[in-house]
Amino acid sequence: MTELTLQRLKASGWTPGRKVDISPIEKAYAEAGMVMPEKLREFFTEFGFLTIRYDIQHTELERHTLNPVSDFLNYSKEDFEHLFDDYEVFGTAYPVGFAYRGNMTIYYHDDGNFYIFMEPNPLYRCGKTADSLFNGLFGGDKSEWVNLDEETGLL
């Protein structure tokens, strides 16, 4: 992780080896008929329920929330099974949380990658680790991110 990523995570209450009770997240997944992948369970156990806040040039407060429970309120498993098919990313997308005051939704996918979706576009593949996801979100390093709108010609 970049130093900036670590600073922002620690300022939000994260510590290395952090473990939290993710039963509310597991319950939301179960109610939607979804089975949480083990890698995502490990991610939530360490990073779940964090809200990363920071000031951008002292004018704006950015906020990233790692709690997908509200994302399930109006959706079911079927809604997430083909979410990225237009990008030729087939399989199930699992909600992780929100970024930039809700303008972006963070997902984990069957293919082992994290993704960020912005309405109306684009979709970014953010790598297979929390490091690559967080470095791009709030650590100043998007080197592992791929804009799938550009890659697939959907822009």
Model-derived features with residue positions:
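Short, compact, well-ordered microdomains
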Residues: 115-119
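Compact, glycine/acidic-enriched structural inserts
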Residues: 121-147
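Short acidic-glycine loop/turn motifs at beta-strand connectors
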Residues: 108-111
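A surface-exposed partner-binding patch
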Residues: 1-103, 149-153
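Generic hydrophobic/packing signal
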Residues: 29, 49-50, 98, 114, ...
